[in-house]
């Protein structure tokens, strides 16, 4: 079975390494952790970095697998997984997401609103150096070594891609919730209760609407899949076998 894990903002596929190490070599051999276009390398020609472009990119990754896949997403990766699974349930064997969801009542966090504002977003990005970003990631629950690694990839093309992505998503709560009833039933939500960006109530409402199991983690932040990699791995293995 093929598994695709999708990172979020402002991350790289390296954020999945603690989970991959825990899952073991047999599972990891059939696991793909692609970088979002524009994050690890310059934006491909013709790719506009909107939320719809990233969903199309993920669906193309799923189609290339040649069989239904297990999808796993965190942060923006979670939003993309839910949307892609809603649009193409025929390509999905199972899905699991953490610490971000398209939910009707959710309002974007403060940093997102800044990024969505022309000029202010560019200024904020310019003032966010790599050291500041590393400290911010660590404060939100990411291990310091990984936070430093992720911050080292804080490039001009990543910053531009992030601004375009967020500005395309001002109305995501309305635009991406109408098809949730099409989600495959084999889903799982994993959550860090102390997430400063997306409150656990968002997960509770989403899971109640979609009848999806919610696994909460006390004293865990936004990067729950890193902080609790062994626990998440155990849940995923059972989820895939069910």
Model features per residue range: what roles?
Residues 106, 127-181:
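Conserved alpha/beta-hydrolase catalytic His-Asp/Glu region
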Residues 220-233:
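Catalytic histidine-centered segment of alpha/beta-hydrolase-like enzymes
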Residues 1-43:
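Conserved HGGG/HGGXW glycine-rich cap/lid loop of the alpha/beta-hydrolase fold
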Residues 158-207, 216, 225:
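Conserved serine/cysteine hydrolase catalytic core
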Residues 4-8, 74, 191:
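The conserved beta1-alpha1 loop
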Residues 32-72:
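Active-site loop/oxyanion-hole signature of alpha/beta-hydrolase fold enzymes
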Residues 86, 94-123:
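Flexible "cap/lid" loop of the alpha/beta hydrolase fold
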Residues 73, 77, 81:
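Gly/Ala-rich beta-loop-alpha elbow adjacent to hydrolase catalytic centers
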């Amino acid at each position: 079975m093929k598994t695709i894990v999708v990172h979020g903002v402002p991350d790289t596929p390296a954020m999945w390494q603690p989970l991959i190490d825990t899952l073991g070599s047999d599972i990891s051999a059939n696991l793909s952790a692609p970088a979002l276009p524009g994050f690890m390398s310059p934006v491909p020609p013709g790719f506009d970095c909107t939320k719809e472009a990233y969903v199309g990119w993920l669906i193309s990754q799923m189609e290339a697998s040649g069989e239904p896949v297990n999808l796993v997403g965190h942060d923006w990766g979670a939003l993309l997984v839910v949307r892609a699974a809603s649009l193409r349930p025929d390509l999905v064997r199972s899905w699991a997401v953490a610490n971000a969801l398209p939910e009707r009542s959710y309002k974007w966090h403060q940093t997102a609103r800044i990024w969505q504002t022309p000029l202010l977003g560019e200024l904020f990005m310019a003032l966010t150096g790599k050291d500041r970003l590393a400290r911010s990631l660590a404060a939100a629950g990411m291990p310091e070594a990984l936070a430093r690694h992720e911050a080292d990839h804080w490039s001009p093309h990543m910053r531009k891609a992030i601004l375009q992505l967020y500005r395309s998503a001002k109305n995501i709560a309305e635009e991406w919730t109408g098809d949730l009833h099409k989600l495959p039933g084999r889903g799982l939500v994993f959550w860090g209760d102390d997430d400063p960006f997306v409150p656990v109530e968002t997960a509770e409402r989403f899971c109640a609407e979609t009848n999806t199991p919610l696994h909460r983690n006390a004293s865990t932040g936004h990067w729950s899949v890193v902080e609790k990699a062994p626990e998440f791995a155990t849940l995923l293995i059972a989820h895939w076998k069910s």
